[in-house]
Design a protein with these regions (language model features):
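Cytosolic catalytic domains that perform sulfur/thiol-centered chemistry
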Residues: 1-282
Length: 282
């Protein structure tokens, strides 16, 4: 039985030598793109392979895209195969930012039709706090056969976001920190603010004080308060570039509210077109 949402540090520790488990290290810092790779080289969870947000999980950005466009599904599938991710594999993704980066790969693998992927709850910080093993060895890859079955209904484009903004028939949830949403502070993108009609729910609201996810019942209560009767399929998630928005998608899955969708281009794509409206404040 595979997990498709969260895996505990205890479960991962018990399966470190299990050939049916594949571990992927997704540590990444938006303001220092090589920091994650460098820290991985110094120490990581045994058998973990490194996955880079820019190089592996994104296509090169253009003047019309956000900062982290989705890669060609076939290219990503080839990488998954090279990392040994075939059928009947439990994939565990982790980072050192409580899932903020690793959730991108969690979402992308589900988008490609691989349900057996889970986030390490509490991530690398919890693993270290518990004094679990780390090493600097590079695992030898064993190529696997895997399928590429992208599901287009999980993705929303800018036109649908524009319609939702104007009509209100879908709920747009922005996962960025409050100050970026209001436009008070914008360290990454040239325009500050948010899509008119969107609501702000920073991804770290999904976390308990120890950096693990809140219990399912607490997440469900929180999201039902946001949805106000709307079904999950009428929810569009966004953030700065389609990364931390996946954290809210995962939280809704844990809460028993599956079916919400991602706007991959997010804010950094939205602002490329000056015809798209921008709001500031709450």
């Amino acid at each position: 039985m595979f997990s498709n949402t969260l895996v505990t540090t205890e479960d991962l520790a018990a399966h470190l030598d299990d050939p049916k488990w594949v571990i992927l290290d997704c540590r990444f810092t938006l303001t220092d793109p090589e920091a994650g790779r460098e820290t991985y080289a110094k120490a990581h969870i045994p058998w973990a392979r490194y996955v880079h947000l820019d190089d592996d999980l994104s296509a090169p950005p253009t003047d019309a895209t956000g900062r982290h466009p989705l890669p060609d599904p076939r290219v990503l599938t080839e990488k998954l195969c090279a990392w040994g991710i075939g059928v009947n594999k439990q994939v565990v993704v982790y980072d050192d930012s409580y899932g903020a980066m690793a959730v991108r790969l969690w979402w992308m693998m589900r988008w490609l039709g691989h349900p057996g992927v889970a986030l390490l709850d509490g991530g690398y910080p919890k693993w270290l706090r518990e004094k679990r093993p780390v090493d600097a060895d590079l695992p030898i890859p064993h190529k696997a056969a895997c399928a590429c079955l992208p599901e287009p209904t999980q993705i929303v484009g800018a036109d649908e976001v524009m319609h939702a903004s104007r009509s209100g028939d879908q709920l747009i949830i922005d996962a960025r920190p409050d100050r970026r949403f209001t436009g008070e502070y914008e360290p990454l993108d040239p325009v500050a603010g948010h899509v008119p009609g969107a609501i702000n729910y920073p991804f770290d609201e999904n976390l308990d004080v120890d950096g693990t996810f809140l219990p399912p019942e607490a997440l469900r209560e929180n999201y039902q308060a946001l949805l106000k009767g709307k079904p999950a399929w009428q929810v569009i998630h966004m953030c700065g570039s389609g990364v931390t928005a996946c954290h809210n998608i995962l939280a809704m899955e844990i809460a028993g509210l599956p079916g919400s969708r991602l706007y991959p281009g997010s804010w950094s794509e939205w602002i490329h077109d000056p015809a798209r409206p921008v709001a500031t404040g709450e």
